[in-house]
Amino acid sequence: LAGDHIYKMNYALMLADHVAKGRACTVACIEVPREEAKGFGVMAVDADWNITDFVEKPADPPSVPGKPGHSLASMGIYIFNAKYLFDELERDMADPNSSHDFGKDIIPRAVRMAQAAAHPFELSCVGTQPGQAPYWRDVGTIDSYWDANIDLTATDPLLNLYDRNWPVWTYQPQLAPAKFVHNEPERRGNAIESLISGGSIISGQVLRSVLFSSVRVHSYSLVEWSVLLPEVEIGRHVRLNRVVIDRGCRIPDGMVIGHDAEADAKRFFRTDSGITLVTAAMLAALPE
């Protein structure tokens, strides 16, 4: 499994498909726009979903037959017959010409040996509404990580975290509920279209943002379209827009981030699409 992908899948259905196809390796796949496919392993399949070609991050991705604008991308979810995998890993370890990579070595070899099958994600995805494409996000970049988090602030997000039939299990420490304090003009703790996690205390304004656990937003501050990781503290009179703040950072009083592209690029890391990443090391490097 890939550790930087977000999706809901019933693995039992993919496992059953693997057994039914009778191949040594099964790779989950999903249709993506051809332009986006350059960042993934891309495959070609026959009518029985046997993989006939596999290329890792191609400059010119092959298209899905009949769909010239789309490609079949690997989701980084593999099922192997155990003995086959152990034998292949030992063989690969002894190969001085191998890069020792699943996408570049193990999977392409399985394809050449006619031992690789594809599993369409639509057969095992969970929680997809009729007419809706299966939800799958690769969050391996700052932009995609920000996008996936901010998506959750929608009134009816594509990924439903409130689905009791298929909950997303994760470790959550025992923390007090989130708290919103003060009710004075210009000093009113509130959050609109936002996700606020346990242990957080809000006395400023939060709009369309995701706050992880134990975040503190002090009075007179405004947080918009931002993702704040655990134990972040936002001082007074701070303004944040389209920012990702790493765990444990303290933003000093009066700091403005996300409103001046040139200043942000000098102090922090700013992506081409305008998302600013702030880490403790970046803050420590700022002049006194």
What are the language-model segments listed below?
Residues 1-3:
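Active-site acidic Asp-centered loop
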Residues 8-83:
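Conserved core of the sugar-phosphate nucleotidyltransferase
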Residues 5, 78, 142:
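Gly/Ser/Thr-rich beta-alpha loop segments that engage phosphate groups in nucleotides
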Residues 83-87, 91-288:
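Left-handed beta-helix
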Residues 5-7, 97:
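Active-site glycine- and acidic-residue-rich loops that bind
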